[in-house]
Curated annotation (Swiss-Prot):
Its main location: membrane. It is an enzyme of class 2 (transferase). The gene is mtgA. Peptidoglycan polymerase that catalyzes glycan chain elongation from lipid-linked precursors. Pathway: Cell wall biogenesis; peptidoglycan biosynthesis. This is Biosynthetic peptidoglycan transglycosylase. GO terms for molecular function: pentosyltransferase activity; peptidoglycan glycosyltransferase activity. It comes from Paraburkholderia phytofirmans (strain DSM 17436 / LMG 22146 / PsJN). It catalyses: [GlcNAc-(1->4)-Mur2Ac(oyl-L-Ala-gamma-D-Glu-L-Lys-D-Ala-D-Ala)](n)-di-trans,octa-cis-undecaprenyl diphosphate + beta-D-GlcNAc-(1->4)-Mur2Ac(oyl-L-Ala-gamma-D-Glu-L-Lys-D-Ala-D-Ala)-di-trans,octa-cis-undecaprenyl diphosphate = [GlcNAc-(1->4)-Mur2Ac(oyl-L-Ala-gamma-D-Glu-L-Lys-D-Ala-D-Ala)](n+1)-di-trans,octa-cis-undecaprenyl diphosphate + di-trans,octa-cis-undecaprenyl diphosphate + H(+). Its EC number is 2.4.99.28. GO terms for cellular component: peptidoglycan-based cell wall; plasma membrane. Keywords: Cell inner membrane, Cell membrane, Cell shape, Cell wall biogenesis/degradation, Glycosyltransferase, Membrane, Peptidoglycan synthesis, Transferase, Transmembrane, Transmembrane helix. The chain crosses the membrane at residues 15-35. It is found in: Cell inner membrane.
Amino acid sequence: MTATRRVSRPGPVRWMVYLGAVVAIAWLATQAFYFGQIAVWNYVNPQSTSFMRSDTWRLSQDRPDLSVQHTWVSYDQISRNLKRAIIASEDANFVNNNGYETDAILQAWERNKAKGKIVRGGSTITQQLARNLFLSREKSYIRKGQELIITWMLETLMDKERIFEIYLNSVEWGNGVYGAEAAAHYYYKTSASKLTAAQSARLAVMLPQPKYFDEHRGSQYLAQRARVIARRMGAAELPD
């Protein structure tokens, strides 16, 4: 008589191992995609970013008559005034840091812990670019961790000038307005290469809340903060 062979079924531990392996492979594939995309963008200009696509879709639902404004220009076609203003306002140590400002991250961590939720991120220019290129607006520690990984990739594969060039051409400056050239035409009827120091300072101050300042251009805070940034611009170090 032939003995019946029992087929063992995977137990819960084995299923957990399988699930962990699938998650790990998916995570590695995602990182490989990001890495490969950044490698390509070191030589090819990105036509859009994750933020631009999601933002323009949302705007198309709320304001279908709104036209998107975005024109890519080379790094040399952007006023040094604007470059200095943004560095003075957003990331004074941009040229010398490795994409992170540890003190700012720790300060943001303490504020977030006190609030019980993520309200600040302590982001450098490179971190902002990482977020705009690939990530959602969701605020979570998982997303922040992914942002730090992408930041490392950007700093590893690109020099500071290329990082700044992509940032300047993709950052949001109002409702449907992306990049320095579009912002210069939208607010001042000029090109990015001809922006004055005063105009550049105002544009730099708008960056954390571009939609708000698009609709509140007479804001007293905007005017006062722009004067502060204008005074700091002379000390801003550029990556060129």
